[in-house]
């Protein structure tokens, strides 16, 4: 309860770099998040280059902290891995529906929440 009651939103960020080692550890720890059917319907786009951050800014609602951050993480609902898995087994993926979108969005949100905690 202490963690929940002390939650806050931060809008001012440090420009201190995040090491590859720390980032890798956090991403790996978040992989333990339960997902729908253990399909892990998410991906994380890691962006450090200025040009990449500029191009991704609209997806982050052009928030100024995106271009100023040393690293930007974009958490995405993603069927790519599961689609390839199905196709390699001569199966039709069948994710073109709202329920699949909700499952993937939920997986991405849960992964992101675990990463941030």
What is the role of each PLM region?
Residues 1-117:
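Acidic, surface-exposed loops and disordered segments
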């Amino acid at each position: 309860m202490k963690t929940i009651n002390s939650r806050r939103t931060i809008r001012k960020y440090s420009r201190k770099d995040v090491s590859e080692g720390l980032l890798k550890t956090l991403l790996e720890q978040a992989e333990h998040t339960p997902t729908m059917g253990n399909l892990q319907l998410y991906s994380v786009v890691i962006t450090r280059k200025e040009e990449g951050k500029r191009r991704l800014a609209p997806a982050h609602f052009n928030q100024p902290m995106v271009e100023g951050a040393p690293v930007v993480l974009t958490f995405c609902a993603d069927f790519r891995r599961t689609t390839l898995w199905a196709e390699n087994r001569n199966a039709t993926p069948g994710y073109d529906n709202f329920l699949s979108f909700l499952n993937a969005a939920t997986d991405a949100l849960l992964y992101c929440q675990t990463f941030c905690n």
